[in-house]
């Protein structure tokens, strides 16, 4: 059995194994535990024993908390599990890498479902709504990072009026650790992420310049508009964390922007997503970089001519635990290019 200490070591958190006494609120959970979660009051009567991680980020947080033996399934994996979590993940039943059915989840007799995205259990979900789980006595918890989108924008992915930050992720880790009565583990993970975030905050451009970034997730084809990280998205957070800013001004979470608009934005750095899926022609980073270097107009952009092109895990462009890993990937490559100290 994989212990929490061995999991910490595998994730590079071994320095936290010997942490001093955790904060006072990291003691045993008192049940029933009631939380306000994305506009819904959730009451947990006891620590879940048969949880499902519905969506990659939710599943990976549960695994990071060492809860694999309290999980009966996972579903909806846009990319492969973090390598350091592979052993723990192998102990949990994979329902499907795509969208499960409500019936397939209920077949595992779950008592709790951690959900990564509002669309998975929202009013327009084709799988199930939160109230459907409530009716059968299954508690749900939705990632706080994904439930703040405004409702007055037509973009199907919603928008953000303020820059996303890690506090929402820390809240998610803290609340999930309370739900499962492992608050000490939650505090250890949060402490690690905060230390890594603080280290990245020290990154500055070598010439003191405020670098501008475009984060390109994918495009259906070379002639199609690009899906890019919006101004206040996790991508915008990464740019800010590294002392720069997002060149995309749209508040939509995932705006589609034509290449004429990207050329006009004139970013100093283009970050291309690495995706495991093969849905679109430009999903793979190699295809993106080839397009950037061969398109007659795009190849003339200063960022392309200066080879200021870096590759990042596409999941890091979503507001997830991957975001900090992605920021570290970008920082390492920019330092190698001489753009960051």
Positions of PLM-derived features:
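Bacterial N-terminal signal peptides that target proteins for export
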Residues: 1-11
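Bacterial N-terminal signal peptides
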Residues: 10-18
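Bacterial Sec-exported substrate-binding components of ABC uptake systems
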Residues: 19-60, 162, 178-216, 335-341
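Short helix-initiation/N-cap motifs at beta->coil->alpha
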Residues: 35-39, 92-103, 251-259
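A short, structured surface patch at a secondary-structure boundary
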Residues: 53-123
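Alpha-helical, coiled-coil/dimerization segments enriched in small aliphatic residues
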Residues: 79-80, 227-254
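Extracytoplasmic ligand-binding site segments that recognize negatively charged/polar headgroups
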Residues: 119-128, 138-175, 206-234
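Structured C-terminal subdomain patch of bacterial secreted/periplasmic proteins
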Residues: 163-172, 271-341
